[in-house]
Design a protein with these regions (language model features):
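Conserved N-proximal alpha/beta basic substrate-recognition cap immediately N-terminal to
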Residues: 31-154
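Phosphate-binding site of ATP-dependent enzymes
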Residues: 158-159, 168-170, 178-268, 272, ...
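Short, strongly patterned local motifs
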Residues: 1-18
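Rossmann-like NAD(P)H-binding beta-loop-alpha module
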Residues: 149-169
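Short glycine-rich anion-binding loops that position phosphate/pyrophosphate groups of nucleotides
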Residues: 101-104, 177-179, 301
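Short glycine-enriched loops at secondary-structure junctions
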Residues: 130-134, 239-242, 289-292
Length: 333
């Protein structure tokens, strides 16, 4: 998914809200893709009309959240995407709204979630819930499940982090609290003369909090991404790091390998499911190394296309089925 596009809005053809069919212009689908391309294509086949917005397209008039949105149509032939002319309207006129904004979590994101929280959710199903997105930092949310995670310390103190490194036996991973795609993640070894320099840079000389976590040697076998829908695992992909890396993220060269959802993975999902549902975090990606949960990705989880390709499945069907059921519950249809 491109970080350019932040929202996907969905309306069925039999809805009261209609799309403009004129003034289309062509764009590269990599910029226009607001969620996995397969999901958008699948919705089109079911007769849904798809629109997209970016953060700057949102605004509030009176007490009504509104936005400037554009119709999106994907095609197999070139050009791969057509985007309609912009038009304005109330967000709750859509049947569903899906927020897909990559980290970092900045003030623009923060205020967008407040605006989206004003949508009448008896009229429009919003996924994930704006309040849940606002409160669920992707690094810190996992700390709500201390029995499922490796030993962890969050601090801005270099001395405290170094003491923790020693306590862990001299190896540790540190990561920023607002990063994504493996950016800013470092492996620390107590014997490395660069350790102090890395901590200085990572903490901005003690002014920025970071997460320190026990190094898990199982990372050599891969970092597993589990796609979770409404608390249930849909599928998983293993991201195996390069020999020279400690990060399995695809952005830094990790190779996607077929894997299974294990009984331990199901245990993790069952442990998280009640809180995920309570927070309205219906579509998430869990990162698991060995038997430990390391992150809960809630803003823009990826992995559907990789699981589809490796397992010859179509996970987007399950996601769209779920959204359709939520909309039907709202409308009573």
């Amino acid at each position: 998914m491109s970080g350019e596009t932040n929202f996907i809005a969905d309306v069925r053809h039999n809805s009261h809200h209609r799309a403009e069919q004129k003034d289309h212009h062509e764009v590269d689908h990599k910029r226009a893709e607001p969620s996995p391309k397969s999901s958008v294509t699948r919705r089109q086949r079911r007769g849904h009309e798809i629109y997209f917005m970016e953060l700057d397209d949102l605004y509030l008039r009176g007490g009504t959240p509104q936005g400037r949105y554009r119709r999106l149509e994907l095609a197999r032939a070139t050009p791969h995407a057509h985007v309609g002319a912009g038009r304005d309207g109330a967000l709750e006129d859509f049947d569903s709204l899906w927020m897909r904004k990559d980290p970092p979590f900045d003030l623009k994101f923060f205020f967008a979630t407040h605006l989206l929280s004003l949508i009448d959710q008896s009229k429009c199903f919003v996924m994930n819930n704006p309040k849940g997105l606002r409160e669920a930092n992707e690094k810190l949310y996992a700390l709500r499940f201390p029995e499922q995670i490796p030993q962890t310390l969050v601090s801005s103190s270099m001395e405290r982090l170094k003491a923790f490194l020693t306590q862990l036996g001299g190896e540790m991973i540190i990561k920023p609290l607002d990063g994504c795609g493996g950016s800013g993640v470092f492996y620390l070894n107590e014997q490395d003369r660069n350790t102090n320099s890395i901590l200085e840079a990572a903490t901005d000389n003690g002014r920025r909090m970071v997460m320190g976590q026990r190094y898990l040697p199982e990372i050599r076998q891969g970092d597993k991404r589990i796609i979770v829908l409404n608390g249930e695992p849909l599928g998983a992909v293993l991201r195996v790091p390069l020999e020279s890396e400690t990060r399995g993220n695809i952005h830094v060269g990790g190779q996607c390998v077929k894997t299974e959802v294990t009984p331990r993975d199901r245990e993790l999902c069952a442990a998280l499911a009640p809180l995920l549902r309570a927070d309205g975090l219906y579509f998430v990606g869990l990162d698991v190394i060995g038997s430990f949960l390391t992150e809960v990705n809630v803003t823009s989880p990826t992995g559907i296309q990789e699981v589809n390709a490796l397992d010859h499945v179509q996970l987007e069907r399950d996601v769209i089925d779920f959204v359709e059921r939520q909309v039907e519950n709202l409308t009573g249809n």
